[in-house]
């Protein structure tokens, strides 16, 4: 820093970033003259912490997207090349075709999730309507019942009607992503409990499971884009790594509070507390 000040005294304009007490500043130091005489130096410091964090997140997101897009594409290309070159036995053909179809579906899902997140980031205004969380929970449970039965996991819905004023598709995304994870990371013979309630001006959606749980030190990161608690299981479990990030952003879009409680080896409970609809379109 002192060297840069001396350089400014010598007539050189100095611009650099400086980190101090957990904040980041853009500093500009320049020589000030009065006539032909040196009057001093001018030092300007701008707090650019938020911009720096945004840029860091953008770079990380771009790197992660590139990796997540490349992985299924490589698998698709590999299978296609083997088939094209006649290196696949007729009896093995269904396996390779299934691989191409599976990885293609994964790629499409990733792109759709990225588009959803982009729309939420941009704050695009989406038409809202009355949505009953109990109906959403019931529909979600029915859609996931096949996956749950395949893993020997029971899915139950209980509670009472709780209406919110919001975007039905986004609220469905919240419920579906939470419940899908609860099934996906559960244990054989486990259970998923979806609860809906209305109290104290809040419409509550609670998803509780008896799954593998999340270590305490990782709980604050599970809603980050592409973050996976257990990377060794990510390929087997599928998914894009964006589901919980969509939950976080969709909840924020509805001014809903998101809380997570988890004990490794015992399970996880996620609660989304929406403003309860009172008949007014301002109830958000």
Language-model features and meaning:
Residues 1-46, 50:
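PAS-family sensory/regulatory modules and their coupling/dimerization elements
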Residues 147-157:
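Short conserved segments within the C-terminal catalytic ATPase subdomain
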Residues 214-228:
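Short conserved segment of the HATPase_c
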Residues 102-107:
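Short alpha-helical segment of the dimerization/phosphotransfer core of two-component systems
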Residues 122-131, 135, 165:
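Short flexible loop/turn segments at helix-to-beta-strand junctions
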Residues 84-91:
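Short acidic helix/loop segment immediately C-terminal to the autophosphorylated histidine
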Residues 255-256:
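Conserved glycine-rich
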């Amino acid at each position: 820093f002192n060297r840069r000040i001396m350089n400014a005294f010598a007539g050189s304009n100095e611009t650099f970033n400086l980190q101090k007490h957990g904040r980041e500043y853009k500093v500009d130091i320049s020589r000030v003259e009065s006539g032909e005489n040196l009057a001093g130096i001018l030092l300007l410091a701008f707090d650019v912490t938020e911009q720096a964090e945004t840029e860091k997140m953008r770079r990380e997101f771009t790197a992660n997207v590139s990796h997540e897009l490349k992985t299924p594409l490589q698998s698709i290309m590999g299978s296609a090349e083997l088939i094209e070159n006649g290196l696949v036995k007729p009896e093995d053909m269904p396996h390779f075709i299934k691989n191409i179809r599976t990885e293609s579906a994964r790629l499409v899902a990733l792109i759709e999730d990225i588009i959803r997140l982009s729309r939420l980031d941009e704050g695009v205004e989406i038409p809202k309507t009355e949505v009953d969380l109990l109906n959403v929970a019931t529909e979600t449970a029915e859609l996931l019942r096949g996956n749950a039965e395949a893993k020997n996991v029971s899915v139950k819905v209980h509670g009472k009607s709780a209406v919110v004023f919001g975007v039905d598709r986004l609220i469905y995304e919240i419920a579906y992503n939470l419940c899908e994870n609860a099934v996906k990371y559960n244990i054989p013979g486990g259970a998923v409990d979806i609860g809906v309630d209305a109290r104290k001006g809040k419409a509550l959606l609670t998803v509780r499971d008896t799954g593998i749980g999340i270590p305490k030190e990782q709980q604050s990161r599970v809603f980050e884009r592409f973050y996976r608690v257990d990377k060794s299981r990510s390929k087997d479990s599928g998914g894009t790594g964006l589901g919980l990030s969509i939950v976080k952003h969709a909840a924020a879009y509805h001014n809903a509070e998101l809380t997570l409680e988890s004990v490794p080896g015992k399970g996880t409970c996620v609660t989304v507390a929406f403003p309860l609809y009172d008949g007014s379109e301002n109830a958000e």
